């Protein structure tokens, strides 16, 4: 079972997706227009608090004592492919795919972008590292990750500040990783 609408309208669906989380129903929720940058539709169509509310369900345990919902907000086309893969493999809980409607640049890749995006299966991973000892860690999900790539470049060029950009597609999955991995990604 799957359903889709604008992310801002997920509020109307909250009782349904909360119950599907508690009942371990593997529903796929697809929400688009994920950011406040969708300004042409006016303030009624700008999701501000919705992602934070959704992330709380990742922290809520279902009756099996597991994360009750998998919430994924991919940063580019490669992460979206990985997110779909994760959604199809998740047969125990609902999955939320929170997608952008904006034209977003694909994130830079050292090797193959899809192979690098597979690291998203751990919830968060280092997308870009400027310098050996970053002074700043920039963390985002979804469409804001590309913005942080640009910000990291400016920090290095204009201020000489080395940074590390992290794509955090799922806070819940990231928190389940070993402490050593979490500290590697976010020292």
Which residues does each predicted region cover?
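Short, conserved loop/helix-junction motifs that constitute active-site signature segments
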Residues: 20-23, 185-187
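Short, basic, glycine/proline-bearing loop/turn elements
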Residues: 1-5, 66-71
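Acidic, glycine-rich active-site loops and adjacent beta-strand->loop/helix elements
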Residues: 5-12, 19, 31-37, 75-79, ...
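Mobile "lid/hinge" segments at catalytic clefts and subdomain interfaces of large enzymes
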Residues: 21-28, 34, 58
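A short, small-residue-rich loop immediately preceding and capping a beta-strand
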Residues: 1-8, 27-30, 140
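Thiamine diphosphate
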Residues: 37-51, 55-66, 70, 80, ...
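Histidine-anchored nucleotide/phosphate-binding helix
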Residues: 13-20, 150-153
